[in-house]
Amino acid sequence: QKNTDESTSVAEDTAIAEEQSRVTLTAERETAATEELQPRDQIMEESVGNCETKTSEETAVPQDEVPAETAQSQPVEYTDLQQITLDSTWEYADHSKINTGAAVLYPASEESGRKGIVIGVNAGHGTSGGAKVKTLCHPDGSAKVTGGSTAAGATEAAAVSGGMTFQDGTPEREVTLRMAQILRDKLLASGYDVLMLRDSEDVQLDNVARTVICNNVANCHIALHWDSGDGKNYDKGCFYISVPEALKTMEPVASHWQQHDTLGTDLVEGLREQGAMIYGKGNMSIDLTQTS
């Protein structure tokens, strides 16, 4: 449910939590190609007007009061945060079954060269009880066209699957959250506002809710995942989830799949340039909430 469930993401929540050991990126463009991103103020004015928001003011410790030997290790204290909840009037919002939680919007500072662009960052999994609840695989109720954690032909999938477990016992949700926090900090430092779809160990937002919020508040959506299932004990590389051919004529996919795949390709190429291992050709076509 894209404009659809979660925008392009590095791999999805309903997804393939059991296929290959490496980080997956599902990157999905919601409204326009990357170079056509709308300013954050316009997005918020047009789309967030109806959503419930709460301002959370946190007080940062003045840097001059922090001992010199520990100043460099102090975590960043963010202020002027907004909690964004699911607006029932948004398209596809009625397909969500778990939606009492909230995403958190982090504004970039003016000192960072604020760009007025909102990047949705989705730390995969992390919704207690999500595996016991079912949501539609596609907005129109049609069946899945590929396999994954939910088999091809199914019309419903777990609202949020539990994810994989690393060989040392660490659950995927913990790793994706830390990844999301690192990505958030880097994006904020570069002037991008960041919409954290999951900002803590647990958020009561299913894959549909996360995607719909992102569709209406962010310029693009990046979901972070890891895969396993083949018994490998090494990192096989990064890839993004591309849109299966069979979905490219179904709305809202038809209006967005090209932007989705373009962003995914750009993300993988950026990782390649930084020396990250890339799996195969850098993409895998899977029918997920974000890609349908």
Model-identified regions with their sequence ranges:
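Catalytic-site microenvironment of enzymes
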Residues: Q1-S292
